[in-house]
């Protein structure tokens, strides 16, 4: 009877998708000879030839890491990038400004809006490189895919219509709502060994599980690639992570990165590429490697990647890319000197070794992804910190952990519990990563197994992971509560808008097991659960399949993109009265002098993530409308003077919200700066966290340190990121102080060469001078002088 019910639900879902197909696939063009190539095959011949040129520039005896090989073989001009300011190529890492030409760009629906609005202003007929848009961030997770998907499509129709029409006009592959999460779709369709791509999402490095250099960027950076302008990256240092042994028992690939995050912290990877190597690599599946690379974003790494592995071949073949598998295997057969492996004598700036054979499961959180605790010590840690000993929901899936392997390992545990007569004591939610994964799990009865346990299958989208979760368990806002997820990020308020929801990150199999106890102190390795019959039940370690034995099921064809064909006859409409979309007005250029009379809008205490600066969740609806979304600027920031959140005070002591005070000052023509602590802008590639302050009159962000992506995004939008030369000076500057820059204008005019100071006038009239540092390159200086990178591109 149960299978019949599940079958009826699946049939109803297929009927629903068929009904939605016209609005999902409306009028997409078909391929013609004039179409720019949308081949999933990387340009291997060109890349290999470029690597040969790099070896000529640096000398054939120079040993290169895998990351260096792929990056340098994508340089626009190898000699210029590698030999300028690098002691004739001897000091490239951390010093060279690499001018790169990526192979591909991927964008998700929330960030694609602003990226496209910027691209459209450049006036080109099509994108210069293959590009794709994936509608995943704006789908709500609440009661299940059958209800949530059509409601989300209807509620976001204007935005989806805009994205689809722009895709048709400019020749971009459009993956409609419900097709899947960007990173899972990229892994299944576009990622390949040796590829270099950009994505407008911080978890783009997920593609590194298949041997690609994939870097998360803001929309302005993506536009560089889309218009065929070289994209600039400070040459990263390389962190080598050597994997030895093989995972045992309950340990999963997720535990490798959870453990590593605890070692490195949220900023320990800043300025580094994490390059995995060693004999343990070949014990991991492709999707397991992708999970590890995905969460490299949580330690601030530029990207993460794995070398070519024999396990890449069956995955590529299973995802209809046998030609890519054959080509990559042929290149890799040349050994360590090939494009797809590090040279034997390559040196790493830092090296960490992890023994997989002794690694135990880890749980990270709450409120930060680097608070890592081994499972064996977690119960003790819960009690020590007075965290809740029960939890409300377990959520598995997402871009980090929705592979066939992940789901079948979780399914194995559900089957064990079903046989023992157990039901989950916490709500269980399942998010398939793509239509291909969902359809395959449906065919193989995995989804019916989850449903038999009362699990709710959400749409193939981000949902709760990005804050699109409408909880139905009536937890009051501000109330301490716990959830367990297999997601990648757990900042306060991220999932449900409640800053007191404690999200503990773990593998999907561990999350699944814990839901049956409903207890944060349960250890499935050692603890048992009493069954309805009174017997004691203990889980066996989970097992699963890397790939489906029957192959992947494609699923509903309505979710497949058509071949990209630019069509200039397609009109891309943006209504002047829209509350969701607004064309961009150019930012004003930098004045012909240093900045004067900047007021300190706010002094931030502690962690300030991109979620803090530009919240997601219900605000995602305004991603294409800069004036409207600017109303959430810094609403999660804590006032250093008072400890209040989103409470700012003007010179008269009057209280305001931060965006309200910023808007008032903008209306008065007053420009301002923000003062912050470490790793400002930690988290996502969300360029709105740079656009919004700029729109409201922000000129400078002064911090102890910055997250890499956010620092770049600020420069692209004409905001100057400065750091304290002496971090103790953070205590010398306060809200409403007045600041003038000294030496900044000359530094910008000199292409980033020069020293900068800030002259600060206190409320008392006292003046102090604070020396500051910057990382401005020549190109970045030109962006700021012009007002933004887009202003520079538009003139070209």
Curated annotation (Swiss-Prot):
Its subcellular locations are: Mitochondrion
Keyword NAD on entry: no
Transit peptide: which residues? 1-28
Q: What is its main location?
A: mitochondrion
Keywords for the protein's UniProt record, in alphabetical order: Iron, Iron-sulfur, Lyase, Metal-binding, Mitochondrion, Transit peptide
The EC designation for this entry is 4.2.1.-
One GO CC term on file: mitochondrion
Highest taxon of the lineage: Eukaryota
Disulphide bond pairs? none
Q: Which residues bind [4Fe-4S] cluster?
A: 399, 462, 465
- Class of enzymatic activity (EC top level): lyase
One MF annotation (Gene Ontology) recorded for this entry? 4 iron, 4 sulfur cluster binding
Region Disordered, annotated ranges: 540-569
Give GO BP annotations, semicolon-separated: tricarboxylic acid cycle
Record-annotated residues binding substrate?
108, 201-203, 489, 494, 685-686
Task: Describe the function of this protein.
Answer: Has no detectable activity towards cis-acontiate or cis-homoaconitate.
The record's misc note reads: The fermenting yeast S.cerevisiae has 2 aconitases, ACO1 essential for the citric acid cycle, and ACO2 specifically and exclusively contributing to lysine biosynthesis. In contrast, in respiring filamentous fungi the ACO2 homologs (acoB) seem enzymatically inactive and the ACO1 homolog (acoA) is solely responsible for these functions.
Q: Could you say which protein family the record assigns here?
A: Belongs to the aconitase/IPM isomerase family.
Name of the protein described by the UniProt record: Putative aconitate hydratase, mitochondrial
State the organism named in the record: Emericella nidulans (strain FGSC A4 / ATCC 38163 / CBS 112.46 / NRRL 194 / M139)
| Name of encoding gene | acoB
């Amino acid at each position: 009877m149960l299978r019949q019910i599940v079958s009826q639900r699946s049939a109803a879902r297929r009927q629903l998708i068929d009904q939605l197909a016209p609005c999902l696939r409306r009028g997409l063009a078909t391929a013609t000879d004039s179409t720019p190539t949308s081949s999933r095959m990387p340009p291997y011949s060109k890349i290999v030839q470029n690597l040969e040129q790099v070896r000529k520039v640096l000398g054939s005896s120079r040993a290169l890491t895998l990351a260096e090989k792929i990056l340098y073989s994508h340089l626009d001009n190898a000699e210029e990038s590698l030999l300028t300011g690098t002691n004739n190529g001897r000091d490239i890492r951390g010093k060279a400004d690499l001018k790169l030409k990526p192979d591909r760009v991927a964008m998700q629906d929330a960030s694609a809006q602003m990226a496209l609005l910027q691209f459209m202003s450049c006036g080109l007929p099509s994108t210069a490189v293959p590009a794709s848009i994936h509608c995943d961030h704006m789908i709500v997770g609440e009661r299940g895919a059958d209800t949530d998907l059509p409601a989300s499509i209807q509620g976001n129709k204007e935005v989806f219509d805009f994205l689809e029409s722009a895709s048709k006009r400019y020749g971009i592959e459009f993956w409609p709502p419900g097709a899947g999460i960007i990173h899972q779709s990229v892994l299944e369709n576009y990622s390949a060994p040796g590829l270099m791509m950009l994505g407008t999402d911080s978890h783009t490095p997920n593609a590194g599980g298949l041997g690609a250099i994939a870097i998360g960027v803001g929309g302005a950076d993506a536009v560089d690639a889309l218009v065929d302008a070289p994209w600039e990256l400070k040459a990263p240092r390389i962190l080598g992570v050597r994997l030895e042994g093989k995972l045992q028992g309950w340990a999963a690939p997720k535990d490798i990165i959870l453990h590593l995050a605890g070692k490195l912290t949220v900023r320990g990877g800043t300025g580094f590429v994490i390059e995995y190597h060693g004999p343990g690599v070949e014990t991991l599946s492709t999707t397991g490697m992708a999970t590890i690379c995905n969460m490299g974003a949580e330690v601030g790494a530029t990207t993460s990647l794995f070398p070519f592995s024999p396990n890449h071949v069956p995955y590529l073949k299973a995802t209809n890319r046998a030609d890519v598998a054959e080509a990559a295997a042929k290149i890799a057969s040349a050994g360590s000197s090939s494009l797809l492996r590090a040279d034997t004598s390559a040196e790493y700036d830092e090296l960490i070794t992890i023994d997989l054979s002794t690694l135990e499961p880890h749980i990270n959180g709450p409120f930060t992804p680097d608070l890592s605790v081994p499972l064996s010590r977690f119960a003790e840690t819960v009690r020590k910190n007075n965290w809740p000993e029960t939890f409300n929901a377990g959520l598995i899936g997402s871009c980090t952990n929705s592979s066939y392997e992940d789901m079948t390992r979780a399914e194995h545990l559900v089957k064990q519990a079903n046989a023992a007569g157990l039901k989950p004591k916490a709500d269980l939610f399942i998010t398939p990563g793509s239509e291909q994964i969902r359809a395959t799990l449906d065919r193989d009865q995995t989804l019916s197994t989850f449903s038999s346990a009362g699990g709710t299958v959400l749409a193939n989208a981000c949902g709760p992971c990005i804050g699109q979760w409408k909880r139905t368990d009536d937890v009051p806002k501000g109330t301490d509560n716990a959830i367990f997820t297999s997601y990648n990020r757990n900042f306060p308020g991220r999932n449900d808008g409640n800053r007191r929801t404690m999200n503990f990150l773990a593998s999907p199999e561990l999350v699944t097991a814990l839901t049956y106890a409903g207890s944060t102190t349960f250890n499935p390795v050692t603890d048992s659960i009493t069954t309805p019959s009174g017997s004691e039940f203990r889980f066996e370690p989970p097992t699963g399949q890397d790939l489906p034995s029957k192959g992947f099921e494609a699923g509903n064809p309505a979710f497949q993109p058509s071949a990209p064909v630019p069509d200039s006859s397609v009109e891309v409409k943006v209504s002047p009265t829209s509350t969701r979309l607004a064309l961009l007005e150019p930012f004003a250029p930098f004045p012909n002098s240093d900045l004067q009379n900047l007021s300190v809008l706010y002094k931030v205490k502690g962690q300030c993530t991109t979620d803090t600066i530009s919240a997601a969740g219900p605000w995602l609806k305004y991603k294409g409308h800069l004036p409207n979304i600017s109303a959430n600027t810094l609403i999660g920031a804590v006032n250093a003077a008072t400890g209040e959140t989103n409470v700012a005070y003007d010179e008269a002591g009057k209280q305001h919200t931060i965006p309200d005070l910023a808007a008032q000052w903008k209306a008065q023509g007053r420009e301002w700066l923000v003062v912050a602590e470490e790793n400002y802008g930690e988290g996502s590639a969300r360029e709105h966290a740079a656009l919004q302050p700029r729109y409201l009159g922000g000129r400078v962000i002064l911090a102890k340190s910055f997250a890499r992506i956010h620092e770049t995004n600020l420069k692209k939008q004409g905001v100057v990121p400065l750091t304290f030369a002496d971090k103790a000076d953070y205590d010398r500057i306060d809200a409403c102080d007045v600041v003038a820059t000294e030496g900044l204008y000359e530094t910008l005019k000199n292409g980033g060469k020069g020293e900068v100071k800030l002259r600060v006038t206190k409320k008392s009239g006292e003046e102090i001078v604070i020396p500051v540092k910057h990382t401005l390159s020549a190109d970045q200086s030109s962006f700021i002088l012009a007002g933004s990178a887009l202003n520079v591109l538009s003139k070209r």
